[in-house]
C-alpha cells in the first residue's frame, strides 16, 4: 500500500534514485495505491548527469511493494522494498533499463514495455 509521503526507490536508469509520492492517481478520494498504479512524485535524490533532476515532479508506476498484492488464485506476492519506474505521458519508461524483478500485474495495465525490459517477471 503506497500512500502520500511514501518514499519509493527508483527501479530504472532515468537518473532519479528516490521519489516522494505526492498523489495516487485515480480519483479525488483515492488514498492508497498498489502494484500497477500510477503516482505523481517528486524526485528527492538524483544522480548527476541523469535525465531527471532533484526537485522534478514526475509520474511513476509502482512495480514492487512491501505490503504485497493479492492475485486471482488467492496467493500473495511481496517484495523487500517499495519501488517505481518513472514513465512518460504515453506510459513508456523514461529510462532504458529496469533493475530488479517486477510483478506480473503490470501486464494488465498497458506497461508491456516495462515488462519486456525487466530482467525478471514474478
Curated annotation (Swiss-Prot):
Molecular function as annotated in GO: large ribosomal subunit rRNA binding; structural constituent of ribosome
Any one GO CC term of the record: cytosolic large ribosomal subunit
Keywords assigned by UniProt, alphabetized: Ribonucleoprotein, Ribosomal protein, RNA-binding, rRNA-binding
GO biological process: translation
PROSITE patterns the UniProt entry points to: RIBOSOMAL_L14
InterPro entries: Ribosomal_uL14 (IPR000218), Ribosomal_uL14_bac-type (IPR005745), Ribosomal_uL14_CS (IPR019972), Ribosomal_uL14_sf (IPR036853)
Keyword RNA-binding set for record: yes
Domain of life: Bacteria
Gene3D superfamilies, A to Z: Ribosomal protein L14
Family, similarity comment: Belongs to the universal ribosomal protein uL14 family.
Function statement: Binds to 23S rRNA. Forms part of two intersubunit bridges in the 70S ribosome.
Subunit details: Part of the 50S ribosomal subunit. Forms a cluster with proteins L3 and L19. In the 70S ribosome, L14 and L19 interact and together make contacts with the 16S rRNA in bridges B5 and B8.
Descriptive protein name: Large ribosomal subunit protein uL14
Amino acid at each position: 500500500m503506497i500512500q502520500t509521503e511514501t518514499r519509493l526507490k527508483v527501479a530504472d536508469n532515468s537518473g532519479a534514485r528516490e521519489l516522494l509520492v505526492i498523489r495516487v492517481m485515480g480519483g479525488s478520494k483515492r488514498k492508497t495505491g498498489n502494484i500497477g498504479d500510477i503516482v505523481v512524485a517528486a524526485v528527492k535524490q538524483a544522480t548527476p548527469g541523469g535525465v531527471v533532476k532533484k526537485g522534478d515532479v514526475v509520474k511513476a508506476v509502482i512495480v514492487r511493494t512491501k505490503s504485497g498484492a493479492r492475485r486471482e488464485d488467492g496467493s500473495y506476492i511481496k517484495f523487500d522494498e517499495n519501488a517505481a519506474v518513472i514513465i512518460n505521458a504515453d506510459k513508456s519508461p523514461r529510462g532504458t533499463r529496469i533493475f530488479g524483478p517486477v510483478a506480473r500485474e503490470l501486464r494488465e495495465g498497458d506497461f508491456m514495455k516495462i515488462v519486456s525490459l525487466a530482467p525478471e517477471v514474478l
